[in-house]
């Protein structure tokens, strides 16, 4: 099969999977404000791949409520593609010949309701050092109008962006350009095609529909193609339920009723809003720049109280929680401490990974061997470090940091899965629980002095971090650490919470 044909198929399948994820909200009782989802229906050109409508309008990260989300979905087979601010005036960037994405945005803003949001969703990434990357919000992908319209002249770095876009759109003033760009979101580096398959499966599992886990052909891709051939593009809540019944997708047993709760210090893009209702979501995105807190924001003084207050409220009102943890490992551990064994809350975790999302619970069956645990003496201090090498070997970097910065640490307890570290080394929720319990037992046996601290360096799925956090009430004073993957600081570890 020609590569171009295969790429075209993959592009349609990617778009279809995005549609199914959005459509699953029509059967989610916690998202009853979602009233219609359409797929390549009549809508503003270039923003009609998927359209989601709300009544009442959904909340946004700003003061306005959103009546509809319009999506342009752009997929590439490889991750080699990248783009910058100049590409937004090139019709070829969206596979068109005449109109650019910005021209289509301007047209759409003139025909659609004022409180609409328009999204460019792409697997491509923004070119390093391109000015576009400096004006995209890490919170919701919107254009940071305060950053773009910064009072500089057209000869400045941001001014060149404004001038190019303004002239391309035949606008006279920056004020007119600002009106066009308001409500425009760019979501780069979106999940892979395979990860989107797992997201569909997870969304369908939550609402009580069958999934497609093992077949090489993903049945819902074919179902989307069939809908297009039948010219069935729009679905209300009633119509989507009827489709599920027609296709025999509804499971015989009703799904358990868990309250969706989301903690977020990283973003997956526009799909984030599906995780949980705003009142059950704590977004910490505005407190971070990359992997580390923004200037003036401290882990213990600012971030920790927000997490604790939010989860205390959840613990007081909910008994069954499905927890979405798109967070730093330290926040996942703190969440486990807040929702510990004595909280009385039954927890189901949505584990995020490179291959998509999956639901993990501590009640799953597992027969994995115990983790391999080795203890190394590195000094005479009374503190102990636990290094979790679950997804990668964290020991060399952790040991180097400890020897240079933490003379009070005398022993390192190193934990690796019996089958070796890697992205798939933890099989499910019960396996994660078993690892956390084993680590807790070893630390208890280490007999730390009362005045000593336990230092935790984790390269592990957040499920392991969460379950280990549930044990920290019994482990004395604990210090969590974050690794500088992006070399924002020194490419090593830095302490985060002390609990």
From Swiss-Prot:
Indicate whether DNA-binding appears among the record's keywords: yes
Kindly summarize what the UniProt induction comment says about this protein's expression: Part of a CBASS operon consisting of cap4-cdnD-cap2-cap3.
Using the UniProt annotation, give all residue ranges assigned to the region (C-terminal SAVED domain): 258-464
Its Enzyme Commission number(s) read: 3.1.-.-
How the protein is affected by changing residue 493 to A?
Greatly reduced DNase activity
| Any one GO molecular-function label of the UniProt entry | endonuclease activity
What modulates its activity? Answer: DNase activity is activated upon ligand binding (cAAG). Inhibited by EDTA.
**Annotated binding of Mg(2+), by residue:** 49, 73
Q: Which InterPro entries match?
A: SAVED
Name any cofactors this protein relies on: Mg(2+)
Residues forming the catalytic site: 49, 72, 74
Effect in UniProt of substituting residue 328 to A = No change in DNase activity
Q: Which UniProt keywords apply?
A: Antiviral defense, DNA-binding, Endonuclease, Hydrolase, Magnesium, Metal-binding, Nuclease, Nucleotide-binding
Cofactor info, note text: Probably binds 2 Mg(2+), only 1 is seen in the crystal structure.
Example of a GO biological process term: defense response to virus
- Which residues lie within the region annotated N-terminal endonuclease domain? 1-226
Highest taxon, organism lineage: Bacteria
What EC class is this?
hydrolase
NCBIfam families referenced in this protein's UniProt entry, alphabetically:
SAVED (NF033611)
- Write out the similarity annotation: Belongs to the Cap4 nuclease family.
Quaternary structure and interacting proteins, as annotated = A monomer in the absence of ligand, in its presence it forms oligomers.
Report the function annotation for this chain. Effector DNase of a CBASS antivirus system. CBASS (cyclic oligonucleotide-based antiphage signaling system) provides immunity against bacteriophages. The CD-NTase protein (CdnD) synthesizes cyclic nucleotides in response to infection; these serve as specific second messenger signals. The signals activate a diverse range of effectors, leading to bacterial cell death and thus abortive phage infection. A type II-C(AAG) CBASS system.
Q: Note what the entry says on domains.
A: The cyclic nucleotide ligand binds in the C-terminal SAVED domain. DNA binding requires the extreme N-terminus.
Q: What is this protein called?
A: CD-NTase-associated protein 4
């Amino acid at each position: 099969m020609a590569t171009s044909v295969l790429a075209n198929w993959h592009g349609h399948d990617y778009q279809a999977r995005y549609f199914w994820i959005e459509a699953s909200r029509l059967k989610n009782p916690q998202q009853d404000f979602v009233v219609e989802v359409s797929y390549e229906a009549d809508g503003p050109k270039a923003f009609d791949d998927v359209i989601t409508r709300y009544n009442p309008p959904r909340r946004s990260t700003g003061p306005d409520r959103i009546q509809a989300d319009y999506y342009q979905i752009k997929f590439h087979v490889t991750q080699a593609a990248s783009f910058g601010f100049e590409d937004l005036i090139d019709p070829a960037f969206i596979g068109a010949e005449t109109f650019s994405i910005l021209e289509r945005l301007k047209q759409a803003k003139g025909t659609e309701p004022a409180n609409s949001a328009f999204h460019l969703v792409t697997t491509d990434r923004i070119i390093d050092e391109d000015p576009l990357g400096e004006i995209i919000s890490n919170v919701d992908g919107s254009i940071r109008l305060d950053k773009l319209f910064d009072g500089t002249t057209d000869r400045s770095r941001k001014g060149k962006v404004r001038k190019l876009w303004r002239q391309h759109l035949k606008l006279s003033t920056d004020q007119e350009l600002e009106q066009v760009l308001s409500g425009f979101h760019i979501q780069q580096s979106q999940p892979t095609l395979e990860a989107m398959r797992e997201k569909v499966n997870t969304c369908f599992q939550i609402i009580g529909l069958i999934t497609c886990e093992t077949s090489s052909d993903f049945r819902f891709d074919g179902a989307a193609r069939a809908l297009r051939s039948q010219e069935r593009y729009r679905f209300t809540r009633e119509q989507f339920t009827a489709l599920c019944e027609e296709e025999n997708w509804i499971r015989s047993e009703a799904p358990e009723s868990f309250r969706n709760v989301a903690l977020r210090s990283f973003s997956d893009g526009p799909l984030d809003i599906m995780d949980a209702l705003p009142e059950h979501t704590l977004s910490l995105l505005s407190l971070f720049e990359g992997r580390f807190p923004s200037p003036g924001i401290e882990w213990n003084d600012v971030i920790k109280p927000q997490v604790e207050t939010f989860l205390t409220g959840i613990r007081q009102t909910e008994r069954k929680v499905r927890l979405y943890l798109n967070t730093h490992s330290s926040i996942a551990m703190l969440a486990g401490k807040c929702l510990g064994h004595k909280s009385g809350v039954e927890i189901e975790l949505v584990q995020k990974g490179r291959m998509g999302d999956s639901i993990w619970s501590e009640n799953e069956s597992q027969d994995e061997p115990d983790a391999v645990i080795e203890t190394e003496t590195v000094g005479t201090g009374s503190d102990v470090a636990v290094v979790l090498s679950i997804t990668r070997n964290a020991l060399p970097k952790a040991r180097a940091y400890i020897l240079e910065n933490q003379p009070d640490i005398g022993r390192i307890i190193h934990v690796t899965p019996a089958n070796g570290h890697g992205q798939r080394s933890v099989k499910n929720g019960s396996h994660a629980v078993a690892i956390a319990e084993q680590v807790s037992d070893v630390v208890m046996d280490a007999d730390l002095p009362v005045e000593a601290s336990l230092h935790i360096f984790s390269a592990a799925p957040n499920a392991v971090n969460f379950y280990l956090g549930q044990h920290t009430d019994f482990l004395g004073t604990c210090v969590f650490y974050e690794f500088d993957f992006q070399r924002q600081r020194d490419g090593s570890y830095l302490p985060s919470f002390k609990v």
